[in-house]
Amino acid sequence: MDLSVKSEENVEYMVEAIKEKLRMVNAGAMRAASFNEEMYEDLRDIYEHVMKRETFSISEMQAITEELGTLIKK
Protein backbone atom coordinates (compact mmCIF):
# COMPACT_ATOMS: atom_id res chain seq x y z
CA MET A 1 0.00 0.00 0.00
CA ASP A 2 1.40 3.38 -1.03
CA LEU A 3 0.66 5.67 1.89
CA SER A 4 2.22 8.63 0.10
CA VAL A 5 -1.01 8.83 -1.92
CA LYS A 6 -3.79 10.75 -0.17
CA SER A 7 -6.93 8.58 -0.34
CA GLU A 8 -9.87 7.54 1.82
CA GLU A 9 -8.67 3.94 1.61
CA ASN A 10 -5.27 4.91 3.03
CA VAL A 11 -6.87 6.96 5.81
CA GLU A 12 -9.02 3.99 6.77
CA TYR A 13 -6.01 1.65 6.69
CA MET A 14 -3.91 3.92 8.92
CA VAL A 15 -6.72 4.61 11.40
CA GLU A 16 -7.50 0.90 11.75
CA ALA A 17 -3.80 0.05 12.19
CA ILE A 18 -3.38 2.73 14.87
CA LYS A 19 -6.48 1.54 16.74
CA GLU A 20 -5.27 -2.06 16.64
CA LYS A 21 -1.71 -1.22 17.69
CA LEU A 22 -2.87 0.95 20.59
CA ARG A 23 -5.62 -1.52 21.51
CA MET A 24 -7.98 1.39 21.92
CA VAL A 25 -10.91 0.69 24.22
CA ASN A 26 -13.26 3.19 22.60
CA ALA A 27 -12.13 2.45 19.04
CA GLY A 28 -15.66 2.90 17.69
CA ALA A 29 -15.43 6.61 18.41
CA MET A 30 -12.57 6.94 15.95
CA ARG A 31 -13.83 6.39 12.40
CA ALA A 32 -11.74 6.96 9.30
CA ALA A 33 -14.53 9.02 7.72
CA SER A 34 -14.25 11.51 10.60
CA PHE A 35 -10.73 12.58 9.68
CA ASN A 36 -10.04 15.79 7.84
CA GLU A 37 -8.35 14.85 4.56
CA GLU A 38 -6.37 18.09 4.64
CA MET A 39 -4.55 16.67 7.67
CA TYR A 40 -3.44 13.54 5.81
CA GLU A 41 0.28 14.16 6.31
CA ASP A 42 -0.22 14.63 10.05
CA LEU A 43 -2.15 11.36 10.25
CA ARG A 44 0.59 9.61 8.31
CA ASP A 45 3.22 10.99 10.70
CA ILE A 46 1.27 9.65 13.68
CA TYR A 47 0.79 6.31 11.92
CA GLU A 48 4.53 5.98 11.22
CA HIS A 49 5.39 6.89 14.82
CA VAL A 50 2.93 4.36 16.24
CA MET A 51 4.08 1.58 13.92
CA LYS A 52 7.75 2.07 14.91
CA ARG A 53 7.10 1.49 18.59
CA GLU A 54 6.48 -1.80 20.36
CA THR A 55 4.93 -0.45 23.54
CA PHE A 56 3.44 2.80 24.81
CA SER A 57 3.02 4.27 28.25
CA ILE A 58 -0.44 5.41 29.27
CA SER A 59 0.62 9.04 28.94
CA GLU A 60 1.97 8.39 25.42
CA MET A 61 -1.28 6.71 24.42
CA GLN A 62 -3.24 9.66 25.80
CA ALA A 63 -1.06 12.13 23.89
CA ILE A 64 -1.48 10.18 20.64
CA THR A 65 -5.24 10.00 21.15
CA GLU A 66 -5.40 13.74 21.82
CA GLU A 67 -3.35 14.45 18.70
CA LEU A 68 -5.65 12.24 16.63
CA GLY A 69 -8.57 14.22 18.05
CA THR A 70 -7.15 17.41 16.55
CA LEU A 71 -7.31 15.82 13.09
CA ILE A 72 -11.02 15.02 13.24
CA LYS A 73 -13.39 17.14 11.14
CA LYS A 74 -15.31 19.68 13.16
UniProtKB/Swiss-Prot annotation:
In terms of superkingdom, the source organism counts as: Bacteria
Question: Which is an annotated Pfam family here?
Answer: DUF1128
Q: What is the lineage of its organism?
A: Bacteria, Bacillati, Bacillota, Bacilli, Bacillales
Do you know which InterPro entries this protein is assigned to? UPF0435
The entry sums up its family as follows: Belongs to the UPF0435 family.
The molecule here is called UPF0435 protein BA_0406/GBAA_0406/BAS0392
What organism does the UniProt record list as the source? Bacillus anthracis
